[in-house]
């Protein structure tokens, strides 16, 4: 149950907000989570792990709902979290009821009469009790079902995906409690026909053979996919991450970066029409077309190149793919790549040197060191050795 709540916190609560709101939420939860300086830079996945440890009852869903109701623009997500929590709670109650019912079915009845070797003998009272009637009906039904159900494991094994839990569930459905061998001279209902039992077994076998598939990515891409030149075709993607608009030239023209993904790969995007910022919301599904691939980026210049998808078909982006797309690259990896590649991550400043009209920062991690030259208005940013520097290049 806690894992279900954690899924809601991570996928709906933390992945559903932008970076600015995430930093705000992290700041407001810092005392409850007891974040230190190193943990201040934790991403959404690590914060979800901390919340699961701090709030073992519901992984922090209630805390997020309270916070989101107070933050402008996050009211809808608060309501969504509330609904998801209610669904998870109902689902958990349903599972407990099913387990209790199954346990009652598997327990032998203490009120059943003792069996006798004379099957034609009449009951002493001259009539059957309700328990006796149930036992009389279950014996032929169960025996026929057990004969017919033998083909179900063969059907299920052809798929190679049958879980032991599904087998136990199937067993509890088709097996009756222990019944006495004593029979009565009166049977209220006709026994279940062999054809009916066979059809039921066959239907259960088909259900068992086709369990729900969990999407798993065999080869998780470590680098963004690239496309070159003008691309007229459309691509259905989910927005994973978006930056705030920033000026990219001396005229003050603005753009923003985004990371989007299909179910098997992810892409870096440059958007030069900031009107589209309203559409680029984390976890939103979009269709992009008529874009230009250049230097590892998808460049979008016009609002007409992006449209919202409302077909009702969800996109399931594997968590491993999300992690790969949001991971800060290592220094040795960046040094091995060509100039002009996309960089988005948080790095530690080891050294700072002012060189006239620009500043040279030396950043590093456990794999090496790299120099970063900063020009123009960015030289006014207060950043010193030991500080963390977020780079979006």
Curated annotation (Swiss-Prot):
Residues 1-87 form the Pyrin domain. InterPro entries: DAPIN, DEATH-like_dom_sf, HIN-200, HIN200/IF120x, NA-bd_OB-fold. Residues 108-118, 126-151, 170-186 have a biased composition (Polar residues). GO terms for biological process: activation of innate immune response; cellular response to interferon-beta. Pfam families: HIN, PYRIN. The keyword Glycosyltransferase does not apply. Residues 82-188 are annotated as: Disordered. SMART domains: PYRIN. Residues 219-393 form the HIN-200 domain. It is found in: Nucleus. SUPFAM superfamilies: HIN-2000 domain-like. GO terms for cellular component: nucleus. PROSITE patterns: DAPIN, HIN_200. Residues 152-169 have a biased composition (Low complexity). Residues 87-102 have a biased composition (Basic residues). CDD domains: Pyrin. Belongs to the HIN-200 family. This is Pyrin and HIN domain-containing protein 1-like. It comes from Mus musculus. The lineage of its organism: Eukaryota, Metazoa, Chordata, Craniata, Vertebrata. The gene is Ifi214.
């Amino acid at each position: 149950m806690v894992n279900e709540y954690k899924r809601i916190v991570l996928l709906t609560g933390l992945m559903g907000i932008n970076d600015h709101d995430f930093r705000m939420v992290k700041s407001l939860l810092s005392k409850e989570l007891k974040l230190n300086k190193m943990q201040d830079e934790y991403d959404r996945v690590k914060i979800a792990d901390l919340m699961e440890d701090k709030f073992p009852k519901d992984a922090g869903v209630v805390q997020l709902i309270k916070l989101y109701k107070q933050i402008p623009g996050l009211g809808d997500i608060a309501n969504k979290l509330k609904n998801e929590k209610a669904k998870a709670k109902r689902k958990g109650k349903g599972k407990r009821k099913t387990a209790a019912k199954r346990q009652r079915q598997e327990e032998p009845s203490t009120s059943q009469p003792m069996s006798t070797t004379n099957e034609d003998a009449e009951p002493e009272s001259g009539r059957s009790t309700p328990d006796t009637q149930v036992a009389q009906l279950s014996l032929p039904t169960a025996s026929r079902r057990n004969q017919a159900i033998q083909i179900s494991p063969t059907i299920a094994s052809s798929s190679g995906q049958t879980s032991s839990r599904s087998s136990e569930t199937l067993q509890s459905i088709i097996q009756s409690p222990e019944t006495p061998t004593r029979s009565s001279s009166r049977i209220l209902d006709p026994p279940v026909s062999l054809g009916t039992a066979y059809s039921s077994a066959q239907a259960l076998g088909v259900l068992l053979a086709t369990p729900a598939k969990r999407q798993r990515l065999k080869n998780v891409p470590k680098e963004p996919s690239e496309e070159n030149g003008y691309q007229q075709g459309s691509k259905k993607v989910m927005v994973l991450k978006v930056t705030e608009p920033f000026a990219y030239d001396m005229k003050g023209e603005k753009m923003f970066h985004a990371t989007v993904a299909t179910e098997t790969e992810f892409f870096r995007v440059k958007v030069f029409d900031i009107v589209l910022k309203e559409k680029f919301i984390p976890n939103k599904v979009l269709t992009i077309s008529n874009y230009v691939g250049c230097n590892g980026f998808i460049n979008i210049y016009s609002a007409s190149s992006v449209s919202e998808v409302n077909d009702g078909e969800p996109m399931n982006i594997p968590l491993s793919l999300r992690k790969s797309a949001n991971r800060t690259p290592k220094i040795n990896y960046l040094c091995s790549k060509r100039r002009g590649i996309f960089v988005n991550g948080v790095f530690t400043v080891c050294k700072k040197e002012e060189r006239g009209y620009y500043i040279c920062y030396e950043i590093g991690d456990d794999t090496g060191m790299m120099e970063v030259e900063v020009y123009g208005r960015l030289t006014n940013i207060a950043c010193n050795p030991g500080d963390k520097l977020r780079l979006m290049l």
